[in-house]
């Protein structure tokens, strides 16, 4: 049975710039916002945009990510006419090969895409924080009779050299793509979100690989090839909150912005919920000694200290005399007595002993998943 649009989430990134936080976890599986993982935003956008069939292409350290996604039930992707499929590298008669780029990952999964038989494919990155209506983007794609639509957003011109930049005509037709140009001509940055007519993209990928001219990356290879061939390539302008959380600084910044309930993410918006897979935990327990200001505290937490402008995920134990400020603490962490944590990210299941100071001064301080720092005489 044919479907109108298939979602493909590229979730195999190693995320080396996140250091300790991606040592054993794929970047899209890194926790965010107290109860989410980064990939929840792309999956929730699909669910809210009526994209009911989604393939998640994984590669690096997929176990946590696979367990989190499961059968897709938290996002409503487990119905008769919907589904989420985990797509990992595999062996065939031609041998086995790791994905060598974004478009190569799609090429390696042509058989899955053909089984879904979509008219359009929606290509997404699994490591961005944003809320977006993909149906509106598809309508723009169809109205313009585009072969490829690239979602873009305006960035300050002085920062444009950090992005892939789309140069357009007066009708937003893309006439040139520049990857991180030293002297950008435009401030329209690619968001790594694409809608392709599947029949044409399939043809381009197959022709390239069959003729020994591999097309490995959407930004570096596919978009320039489409423009050079005179295809209808258009920019779709997105206005809203969007953050690439691929560095420690950007992850920390976005986490702190998440504490502002008036930000453009608006997690309280019932019309566009962000869904996630969460284990059932006991209610949080707040002692009479707790001092809290502008913070998110998850289920299962025991807090007996001071929490200021911070996020505490689920099942965190904070003992007496401890102060946490401007920090993101991931789930399962134990923090002892008289600890000071400021401008930091603490990974899942870490153990912080008594009287320890973790203070990010010139840069954000990071404690990895399961890392132990100091000793605690009363660990529970």
Curated annotation (Swiss-Prot):
UniProt cross-references to InterPro entries, sorted A to Z: ADP-Glc_PPase, ADP_Glu_pyroP_CS, GlgC_bac, GlmU/GlgC-like_hexapep, NTP_transferase_dom, Nucleotide-diphossugar_trans, Trimer_LpxA-like_sf
- Which reactions fall under this protein's catalytic activity? alpha-D-glucose 1-phosphate + ATP + H(+) = ADP-alpha-D-glucose + diphosphate
Q: How does it assemble?
A: Homotetramer.
Q: Which domain of life is it from?
A: Bacteria
**Family recorded in the similarity comment:** Belongs to the bacterial/plant glucose-1-phosphate adenylyltransferase family.
SUPFAM superfamilies in alphabetical order = Nucleotide-diphospho-sugar transferases (SSF53448), Trimeric LpxA-like enzymes (SSF51161)
Which Gene Ontology BP annotations are present?
Answer: glycogen biosynthetic process
**Which EC numbers characterise this protein's activity in its record?**
2.7.7.27
- Protein name in the entry: Glucose-1-phosphate adenylyltransferase
Give coiled-coil spans as residue ranges.
Answer: none
Q: Say yes or no: keyword Endoplasmic reticulum present.
A: no
Pfam families (alphabetical): Hexapep_GlmU, NTP_transferase
Function comment = Involved in the biosynthesis of ADP-glucose, a building block required for the elongation reactions to produce glycogen. Catalyzes the reaction between ATP and alpha-D-glucose 1-phosphate (G1P) to produce pyrophosphate and ADP-Glc.
Functional pathway: Glycan biosynthesis; glycogen biosynthesis
Lineage, uppermost ranks: Bacteria, Bacillati, Bacillota, Bacilli, Lactobacillales
Q: Name one GO molecular function term.
A: glucose-1-phosphate adenylyltransferase activity
Residues that coordinate or bind alpha-D-glucose 1-phosphate: 164, 179-180, 190
Keywords of the record: ATP-binding, Carbohydrate metabolism, Glycogen biosynthesis, Glycogen metabolism, Nucleotide-binding, Nucleotidyltransferase, Transferase
């Amino acid at each position: 049975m044919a479907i109108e649009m298939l979602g493909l989430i590229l979730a195999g990134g190693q995320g080396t710039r996140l250091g300790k936080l991606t040592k054993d976890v794929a970047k899209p599986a890194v926790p965010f916002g107290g109860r989410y993982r980064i990939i929840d935003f792309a999956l929730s956008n699909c669910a809210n945009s009526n994209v009911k069939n989604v393939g998640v292409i994984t590669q690096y350290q997929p176990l946590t990510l696979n367990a989190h996604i499961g059968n897709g039930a938290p996002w409503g992707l487990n119905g008769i006419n919907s589904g989420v499929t985990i797509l990992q590298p595999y062996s065939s008669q031609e041998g086995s090969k790791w994905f060598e780029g974004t478009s190569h990952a799609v090429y390696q999964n042509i058989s899955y895409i053909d089984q879904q038989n979509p008219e359009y494919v929606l290509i997404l990155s699994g490591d961005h924080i944003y809320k977006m209506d993909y149906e509106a983007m598809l309508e723009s794609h169809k109205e313009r009779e585009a072969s490829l639509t690239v979602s873009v957003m305006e960035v300050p011109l002085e920062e444009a050299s950090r992005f892939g930049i789309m140069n357009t005509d007066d009708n937003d037709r893309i006439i040139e793509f520049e990857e991180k140009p030293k002297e950008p001509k435009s401030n329209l940055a690619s968001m790594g979100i694409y809608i392709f007519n599947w029949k044409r993209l399939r043809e381009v990928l197959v022709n390239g690989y069959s003729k020994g001219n591999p097309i490995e990356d959407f930004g570096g290879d596919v978009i320039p090839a489409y423009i050079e061939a005179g295809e209808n390539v258009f920019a779709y302008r997105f206005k809203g909150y969007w953050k690439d959380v691929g560095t420690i600084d950007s992850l920390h910044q976005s986490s702190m912005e998440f504490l502002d309930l008036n930000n453009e993410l608006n997690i309280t918006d019932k019309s566009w919920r962000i869904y996630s897979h969460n284990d059932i935990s006991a209610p949080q327990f707040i002692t009479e000694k707790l001092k809290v200001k502008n913070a998110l505290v998850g289920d299962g937490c025991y807090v007996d200290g001071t929490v200021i402008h911070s996020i505490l995920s689920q099942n965190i134990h904070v003992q007496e005399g401890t102060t946490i400020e401007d920090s993101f603490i991931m789930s399962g962490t134990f923090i002892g007595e008289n600890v000071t944590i400021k401008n930091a990210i603490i990974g899942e299941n870490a153990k912080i002993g008594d009287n320890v100071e973790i203070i990010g001064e010139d840069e954000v301080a990071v404690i990895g998943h399961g890392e132990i720092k100091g000793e605690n005489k009363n660990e529970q």
